[in-house]
């Protein structure tokens, strides 16, 4: 029994699928070295050593998850395929809490695929007063609150070199790998430029960390060549990929899935997601209608329901002085 994992499950009130996913993570990280191979002056020798390291780590993983065929990145990386609405963000919080409390890992880098999710993640991880704060109940984070570093404040970040504070960097993928344009000229992304405060770029700072873990929200967005290359260059000790769509841009399934709880399972369980209601006619008989005619009828019915609902909402707004 893993006491730390069980405590996190209870404190965060994890749903059953999320608790199962956390259990998988605990077994996997016990198998991994969670360290980078030593750097070598001979780059060719270093590349060979790193390839051997990855193969060895994959073999260890297969002892727990034989269906994990490949990391798909230049570092150990696991995909959690979990249906939308189950709580992938909460699982990320649970994973961070476990890796910190059980393994002493202090540096985490979270990637968001767009501005909307970036802003949501900043609040989920950085606002203890927020009702959906992901670490609510983790007492260790009350006395040692995580330092949240974002794509907006990383150049002004303080306490980066604290010996015991957990650091969570949250970046929108566009700031992470998109070339900047100043004066009409393309240049390196700002996070790759020299920071006077750090004495190096923030990217180089992350690369230099011996315990960096990267978490990818909507991970299917980061399998394109540019994103994948930029992430690989960070060389973290571990990657955790969260997605409800575990396929790449070519439609191929991920080879590094270690846990799956898909929409079909969620609908069958009937506990966590709403079952969609489909508008249909009472006592409807298809008769001699063709497939095309039937599709048109379905669309017309859907439009009718939409207009009916819209009318009721407008009436409600007028009657209650709402915009």
Q: Predicted regions span which residues?
A:
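Conserved pre-motif I regulatory segment
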Residues: 1-81
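Conserved nucleotide-binding/hydrolysis micro-motifs of P-loop NTPases
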Residues: 115-118, 174-178, 220-221, 245-249, ...
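Conserved interdomain linker/interface between the two RecA-like ATPase lobes of SF2 helicase motors
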Residues: 254-323
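Post-DEXD/H (motif II) to motif III coupling segment of the RecA-like Helicase ATP-binding lobe
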Residues: 223-275
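Conserved SF1/SF2 helicase motif Ia
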Residues: 81-82, 86, 93-119
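Phosphate/oxyanion-binding active-site loops and adjacent basic polyanion-contact surfaces
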Residues: 13-22, 84-92, 117, 255, ...
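Conserved RecA-like ASCE ATPase "motif II neighborhood" in helicase/translocase motors
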Residues: 150-230
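Conserved Walker A/P-loop ATP-binding site and its immediately adjacent core
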Residues: 104-136, 142-143, 174-175
